[in-house]
């Protein structure tokens, strides 16, 4: 992603994406509801799902790029039934990103650094370990963004999920980074359970055909 092209797009399209101030010269990029309902996604908007940038659009925090629903959205990948994949159970909560910024943990959701959901996330973080231990874990990995699914009792869903933080993966704070975690099961599960003492989502190795069939039987979200 070219940061100058992204900045030009964001500034030229306020009806499609907001640039919400988050203090100290940083901004949260968030797509509008119109993008979601009218399926207006493009390469720029795919990155505007809670990414935090400075005034020059250098990355401060970079959560997931948009992931398309397989078999539902037109831009989702198309794979043959015999292709082998690794699937991860989707925890039923809301996305949280963390990075080290200005000598503290910067916690954010897909659109804010100071809403109720950020408060919920911080509350759930303390169920796993004390704030000082979180500071040590995140500060020792400065320059990276860590992604979680947070399940909080004040954000109920039809499918009941165990409360807490579910570690999903991490990536470097740069525009050319890729998400890590999904390609190294053992390492990231050890990090989730031993270093940050969070839940780790289950993974399954199977073919696409087997996965599609299994998705019709399971009772969790996806």
Where are the model-predicted features located?
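Core nucleotide-handling region used for phosphoryl-transfer chemistry
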Residues: 1-222
């Amino acid at each position: 992603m070219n940061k100058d092209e992204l900045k030009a797009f964001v500034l030229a399209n306020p009806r499609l994406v907001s640039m919400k101030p988050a203090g100290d010269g940083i901004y949260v990029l968030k797509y509008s509801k119109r993008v979601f309902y009218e399926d207006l996604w493009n390469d720029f908007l795919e990155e505007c799902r809670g990414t935090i940038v400075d005034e020059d659009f250098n990355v401060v925090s970079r959560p997931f790029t948009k992931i398309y629903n397989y078999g539902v959205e037109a831009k989702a990948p198309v794979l043959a039934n015999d292709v082998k994949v690794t699937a991860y159970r989707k925890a039923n909560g809301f996305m949280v990103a963390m990075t080290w910024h200005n000598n503290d943990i910067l916690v954010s959701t897909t659109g804010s650094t100071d809403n109720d959901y950020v408060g919920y996330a911080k509350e759930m973080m303390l169920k796993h370990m004390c704030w000082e231990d979180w500071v040590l874990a995140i500060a020792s990995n400065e320059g990276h963004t860590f992604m979680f699914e947070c399940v909080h009792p004040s954000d109920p869903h039809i499918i009941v999920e165990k409360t807490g933080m579910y570690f999903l993966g991490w990536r470097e704070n740069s525009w050319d980074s890729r998400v890590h975690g999904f390609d190294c099961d053992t390492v990231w599960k050890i990090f989730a359970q031993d270093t940050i003492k969070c839940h780790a989502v289950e993974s399954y190795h199977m073919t696409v055909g087997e996965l599609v069939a299994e998705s019709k039987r399971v009772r969790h979200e996806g």
